[in-house]
Design a protein with these regions (language model features):
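Flavin-dependent oxidoreductase catalytic core characteristic
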Residues: 2-356
Length: 356
């Protein structure tokens, strides 16, 4: 509904109370507030009825007959928000990394007795603190590009998968931003604590990203539920144990040539091979999903209702979502590198895919 809350003189209308949320950890330029309504009547013509209407006789009507399709059609705006939030979060992570890496390249500390002090970035441990997050930033950048393009060119049939992917990426990226900025702050020492260096503001403003547009843990459960649903569709009414054994067998066969656990191949070129990495991520995703399906079926067979079984399964379901998103991000990162024509840039990006 469209609900007027003030008159033409901007006075609050009767029955309506407007309050400010108060000072927050960050984003204080955003005017978050509370509105309450007490016996406020809303005219019928104020109803937003693009996807559903109520007739004069009080009957519900909709041009979209399927309840499921109507629900996901109306979720379109929410999905857009879940794409915008991680893009904003990733921008903050990139900024923090730029500040921390540039600072550590200039900040000198210790060195050989007869030589000048060396940049902090020269220390392997410092590289291990920051470079994995830099690799993450590239992987997440290309993954979010992929999601954005799919959303912009979506069809109704794609919406459930896009909604699940957006939910998962929102959680994955905002958690990564939280961890990235914390590591950047610590890697800059006391300088990272100074407001003039911006990391504190970046941390404060992005902290809320892990819970608005949906709590991250709940969103990951949504993603996992979608993956289990897709898993079930692929195999129809097959026995879950049969499905598990089939998928495991297929996955092991597909990866056997490049799986060091199967072939005992510990050659450096093999272990650093990009296709091996992607095969391994795919294998992991399939195995975790199949094992979760089998476990869920057993819980239900043992007498738990589906609600309680899902409650027991939540930690396992988060692993499904993690494995799925790990694979998608690596897949899109690798695809972007393959399309890069600048050979010098391609070499650097290839290295970053390996770090990821």
């Amino acid at each position: 509904f469209i609900v007027p809350i003030r008159d033409k003189e901007m006075n609050v209308l009767p029955g309506i109370t407007i309050l400010d949320c108060g000072h927050k950890m960050g984003l204080n330029g955003v005017d978050n507030g509370i509105i309450t309504f007490d016996s406020v009547e809303i005219p019928y013509e104020n109803m937003l009825d693009r996807f559903a209407q109520v007739s004069d006789a009080g009957e519900f009507e909709s041009p979209i007959p399927s309840d499921n399709r109507r629900f996901f059609t109306m979720l379109g705006t929410l999905v857009g928000g879940r794409i915008g939030i991680p893009r904003s979060a990733l921008a903050a992570a990139k900024t923090g990394l730029t500040i921390a890496i540039k600072y550590s390249d200039k900040r000198r500390q210790f060195g050989p007795e007869t030589a000048p002090e060396v940049p902090v970035l020269n220390y392997r441990m410092h590289q291990r603190r920051l470079m994995p997050y830099l690799a993450n930033a590239y992987a997440l950048h290309f993954g979010l590009q992929y999601l954005t393009k799919r959303f912009m060119h979506r069809s109704e049939d794609d919406m459930q998968e896009i909604e699940a992917l957006a939910a998962g990426m929102k959680a994955y990226v905002t958690w990564n931003t939280r961890d990235t900025l914390q590591e950047c702050r610590e890697a800059c020492g006391g300088k990272g604590y100074l407001s003039e260096n911006r990391i504190g503001d970046l941390k404060a403003d992005t902290e809320i990203y892990t819970t608005f547009e949906g709590d991250n843990t709940v969103l990951m459960q949504l993603t996992a539920k979608n993956r289990l649903g897709e898993f079930r569709k692929q195999f129809g009414e097959m026995n879950v144990s049969t499905i598990f054994n089939y998928v495991l067998g297929q996955a092991k066969t597909a990866i056997a040539e490049k799986n060091p656990f199967a072939t005992r191949n510990t050659d450096e070129s093999h272990l650093k091979d990009a296709q091996f990495h992607l095969d391994a991520f795919t294998y992991r995703e399939k195995e975790i999903t199949a094992s979760a399906a089998r476990r869920f079926k057993k819980l239900v067979d043992d007498g738990l209702d589906t609600f309680d079984a899902a409650n027991v399964m939540h930690p396992h379901m988060l692993q499904i979502a993690d494995a799925y998103l790990d694979r998608v991000f690596l897949e899109q990162f690798s695809a972007a590198v393959a399309e890069t024509s600048d050979e010098a840039l391609k070499e650097v990006l290839n290295y970053k895919t390996k770090v990821y």
